Amino acid sequence: DGRLKAPGKLSSLTPEYGQCAGSNQSPVNLSGLVKADLAPLQFHYQAGGKTLVNNGHTVQVNYAPGSTLELDGMHFELKQFHFHAPSENLIEGRSYPLEGHLVHANDKGELAVVAVMFEPGQANGALSQAWQVLPAKAGEIHAFKEPISAEQLLPAQHDYYRFSGSLTTPPCLEGVRWLVMKEPVQASQAQIDAFKAVMHHPNNRPVQPLNGRLVLE
């Protein structure tokens, strides 16, 4: 699977990797930060995590309809969240041991991804619940007894960095609104290690060039 063996050379593999050689790719090293009057993010989340799937390149929680993010005067519905270890994005050169991506879409199909950095510390409530049924093998899918709330993945402060980027896995679709939380959240080292154990390999795409894109804060 090329996604696992050559995450940095996705564009050269097959046609479905179409935009992976584009100039607005993710992840990035968030640097050269530009002060901007970014509107506060408005999260309207409810407990909606239904199933947990190991798709071979991440572990993903699929979310029931009804949880939204208000951004740019539009409602973006939370579709799923998943994880990367180590982090894909860097904040001024700093890597974190784990990064969560909360993937949202509006009714036009436009995407907004909220990225949350994890640092070792206290156990995270959402991960405690999810990892009880952590699927060990690619293709496994497990249902939760009780729905999980993505709100437990968010930091207390919702200050963020913003840039325009892409999906970090094929087809590397560009035009994605990226919102990277400034404040990290905590996960226990055991939680981080459990994710890494089922992945068997780092699942972060290498940092892509900014190519003149601005990172707003």
What are these regions (language model features)?
Residues 1-217:
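Alpha-carbonic anhydrase
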